[in-house]
Amino acid sequence: FSKSEIVKYYHVNPEKITVVYNAWQHMQRVRPDPMLFGEYSKWPQLKKGEYYFSMSNLLKNKNFPWVLRAAQSKPQVMFAIAGGGSLAKEAAALGLDHLNNVMYLGYVTDGEAKSLMENCKAFLFPTLYEGFGIPPLEAIACGAPRVMVSNTPCMREIYGSHADYIDLSTNHGSVDHVTPGRDAAAVLQKYSWEGSARRMLE
């Protein structure tokens, strides 16, 4: 996808472009935070397997409002959103700051992110535009039971049939209306930092 965009907008000879993908093995070195769901949890409202998790910021391509609308449609389930920027202020500007089932976690450590990914109900990534989109791959590597991504050319290229797809043209905020994928963990076999390094050296 990124290669085709470069060719389209910068008129570069496609034969001069080599695609080298991101990977996920760095998450193997991260130790999940053991205290996150313990007796003295930082976020006691979050229960294992009972919350949706997303990582966002105020960049429009991240489609933060979609997550809020999804939370609005499921008031009985918690939605945890990690990331920088004044997300709460943006929610207020959208008139969606009244949602009691949304938690703004701010910046999280790698250990916290891993723990949040492996214990969530599903990881949400409703992006409008990406060059790769590594967070869903990290979530799969961490053991997230479901990963929901937007049905865009980039996401289709990276995740194939191994993710649940959100059709943003018709789905304006629902985690229930998605096209299910299969065997998400199988996508991990496609990407490795070692393979990417070899390709760079070539």
Label for each model-derived stretch:
Residues 1-202:
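Carbohydrate transferase catalytic cores enriched for Leloir-type hexosyltransferases
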